[in-house]
A protein has these predicted regions:
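Glycine-rich phosphate-binding loop of ATP-dependent small-molecule kinases
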Residues: 1-222
Length: 222
């Protein structure tokens, strides 16, 4: 199974993506890791990408798309979950064209929907446990709200990430994601149109619900 997943930062996309990955034994392919792997291995594409990154510039799509495909064909040969790409409408169209040319199926697209303000509140409400950062603690979500400054799972001390408290940075990321004309949601809606044509499946999930309810809904639809 090959799956593409969308969701704003703060929507629980990582949690639900891990569920799908583990359930179907998929390779979790995250956009940032693609660049890191190619650069670390010194591939031709990696060297080209590094030149742009070192100059603080965005890597062009004609380099990014082949890098993504290479990882999908190798690491994801037995099935993949692609997370964090595409980020805009142009990339979505180019990715779809490339998949078609390579004869790679896109079996399912998952979109986790969440109101922008709620997503921001969740990001700013995240707290990390000193013993295990994966312990769920968030002052903005009643189901996983910690007891003061201690972890609700183990009692360890909690702290917040500095970037989680940077409203300007959060707003910039969300400006890109919630852009329905050219941004990430525009990319998601491109695949939604393909699903209407019977070319893939499109699953919409209400990210405002609790984790277990979203999980059950996702598994039922898969």
């Amino acid at each position: 199974m090959n799956v593409l997943i969308f969701g704003p930062n703060g929507s629980g996309k990582g949690t639900q993506g891990s569920l799908v990955k583990d359930r179907y034994n998929l390779a979790h392919i995250e956009s940032g890791a693609i660049f890191r792997n190619h650069i670390k291995q010194g591939t031709e594409l990696g060297q080209k990408a590094k030149a742009y990154i070192d100059q603080g510039e965005l890597v062009p799509d004609d380099i990014t798309i082949p890098m993504v495909l290479e990882v999908l064909k190798n690491e994801g040969k037995d099935g993949w979950l692609l997370d964090g790409f595409p980020r805009n409408l142009t990339q979505a169209k180019k990715l779809w064209e490339a998949l078609q040319e390579e004869g790679i199926n896109l079996d399912c697209v998952i979109e986790i929907q969440l109101d922008r303000q709620e997503a921001k509140d969740r990001i700013m409400g995240r707290r990390l446990c000193e013993n295990d950062p994966n312990h769920p603690n968030n002052v903005a979500i009643d189901a996983i709200k910690p007891d003061g400054d201690t972890c609700r799972v183990c009692g360890g001390a909690l702290k917040s990430r500095s970037d989680d408290q940077d409203e300007d940075a959060i707003d910039k990321r969300h400006d890109i994601y919630y852009d329905t004309q050219n941004g990430t949601l525009a990319a998601a809606y491109f695949f939604k149109d393909l699903a209407r044509q019977g070319k893939t499946r499109y699953i919409e999930l209400d990210g405002a619900r609790d984790i277990q309810t979203i999980k059950n809904d996702l598994l039922n639809q898969l």
